A protein has these predicted regions:
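Conserved, carboxylate-rich catalytic/transport cores that coordinate ions
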Residues: 221
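An aromatic/glycine/proline-enriched structural segment found at the starts
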Residues: 25-36, 194, 198, 202, ...
Length: 488
């Protein structure tokens, strides 16, 4: 997801991202229980074919004839983790420029071409991948494929477009770097991943973006954009022969090349680190807690996913019940498992009243501990599984949703049968499975914690709840590239 901190203006590939609203400054919310999930309705994954072109491009065709539309999603196995040293944001800048002019079309001509057929063309980059997606009606399928091939294979990286995108990205980052939620997530990533590329915002930072040259962008594209490093999903109202014919026509003469990923360090072992970012104008505290977890391909992924959903997933999760319903400390609370190619993390988050900051972070850590120590009840697990299986049809309801699912599965080198058997595999997880993975991967004594808010109003609480060994950093002194996170 590709869960990384990214700009709102860049559409980022993600395996599953959650958006959590900010807490309201209020107290004594009424206790409430969310509605029960609806019974699972029958659903079957549409027929598909997976083929490989002679040049090495993997092509997945999913025949989905419920609407007269087609989605094409092309994924390149290179994202922000492959950014050149000191030039974070390269992959994101490359992605933002794909539809801003090619060797044959200007940015305006691309926009006019897609608008004239009522379609959509988007591109973005995450930690592990760069992707582009085109959505068109069935009668414009060939036009959409031509546009996708053009922006992927022949981006112009025009100097004026580079500067326009650079300026916009830096301006957006300036806004984000004043947002407590963005700051908290960015700092937590650094605590979890250290100096591994996963520890830095995919979008880069203002100083790294300023260093990126046109040659850097062209070299990133030349080095990693290759058919044998790409996955193409074509989903919608097409036949396998139509789709494969179009893929061969547009991408068949794209030359295979050797692709050498840069060497990446192993993520560090989890260690506890508590950081308070002082932002005196804050009216509440952004609280983030997390640790290193498992990669997407782990055989324990399904069980771990359910453990984290019980902790803080959709519906009546434990964090929501304790923090909001029982204690009235926050408006919302959640936890997410964020798996990537080389590693992953589990994080919990909430925004709470300043005077409740210490209590909130204590509760979150205690719930991580309870997950590891206590076997969950059958009814609690059944509720989480009912939500997962009941909402699964929404993830394969449209061509665009299916395209995201299938490229994810192929990218992580999983079987497409994972989508066919999702419900059976989800329901097969037992309370003992959840306890086993929680004990194997959850380490409450090594959780990292970040709080962003008016430190003068809550820092004295931390020692009283067992977290007195914290680092205090004024927001104006924050430097994500420094080992101690401080400007010098």
């Amino acid at each position: 997801m590709l869960h990384r901190v990214a700009l709102a203006s860049v559409i980022v590939f993600a395996v599953g991202a959650a958006s959590v609203g900010r807490a309201q400054v209020a107290t004594n919310w009424p206790s409430e229980n969310p509605p029960r999930p609806l019974p699972s309705r029958p659903v079957s994954f549409p027929p598909y074919e997976l083929r490989t072109l002679p040049n090495g491009m993997q092509v997945i065709v999913v025949m989905h004839h419920e609407q007269p539309e087609v989605t094409m999603r092309l994924l390149v196995r290179a994202g922000a983790a492959y950014d050149p040293p000191g030039k974070g944001g390269t992959a994101s800048l490359v992605a933002s420029l794909l539809n801003q002019g090619t060797a044959t079309r200007s940015a305006r001509e691309i926009a006019d071409a897609i608008d004239s057929i009522g379609g959509a063309l988007d591109a973005g980059a995450g930690s592990d991948v760069t992707s582009a997606t085109v959505l068109v009606m069935k009668d414009s399928f060939d036009v959409g494929m031509n546009l996708l091939g053009d922006v992927i294979r022949r981006p112009a990286f025009a100097p004026e477009e580079i500067e326009r995108q650079r300026t916009q990205t830096i301006q957006n980052l300036g806004v984000s770097l004043e947002d407590p939620d963005f700051i908290a997530r960015a700092v937590l990533n650094r605590l979890i991943y250290g100096f591994h590329p996963y520890g830095f915002p995919d979008s880069g930072m203002p100083d790294t973006i300023a260093k990126i040259t046109r040659e850097d962008l062209r070299e990133f594209h030349r080095r990693y954009f290759a058919p044998n490093n790409s996955i193409l999903a074509i989903v919608g109202d097409v036949t396998a022969d139509e789709a494969m014919g179009a893929a061969t026509r547009v991408f068949g003469d794209w030359q295979r090349q050797a692709v050498q990923p840069p060497p990446l360090p192993e993520p560090p072992r989890p260690t506890r680190r508590i950081v308070v970012i002082d932002k005196p104008d804050s009216v509440q505290t952004a609280v983030r807690v997390g640790q290193l977890a498992i990669a997407r391909k782990s055989p324990d992924y399904m069980s771990m996913d359910q453990a984290v959903r019980i902790l803080g997933g959709e519906g009546s999760n434990r964090l929501f019940r304790v923090l909001r319903s029982e204690r009235g400390l926050t408006y919302s609370a959640s936890a997410d498992l964020n798996p990537m190619l080389l590693a992953g993390d589990v994080t919990a988050e909430t925004d709470t009243r300043t005077e409740a900051s210490g209590e909130a972070v204590r509760v979150i850590v205690d719930e991580f501990t309870r997950l590891q120590r206590e076997r969950i009840g059958d009814a609690e697990l059944a509720g989480a599984q009912a939500y997962m299986t009941g909402s699964f049809p929404l993830t394969i309801e449209t061509p665009g949703a299916i395209a995201r699912q299938v490229v994810n599965v192929v990218f992580y080198d999983l079987s497409l049968d994972e989508l066919r058997t999702y419900r059976q595999r989800a329901n097969a997880v037992t309370p003992d499975d959840v306890l086993r993975v929680a004990r194997a991967y959850v380490q409450p004594d090594r959780l990292s914690m970040v709080m962003v808010g008016d430190a003068a109003r809550f820092k004295d609480q931390l020692g009283k709840v067992g977290f007195g060994n914290y680092e205090l950093i004024p927001l104006s002194s924050l430097d994500l590239s420094a080992a101690d996170l401080k400007k010098h």
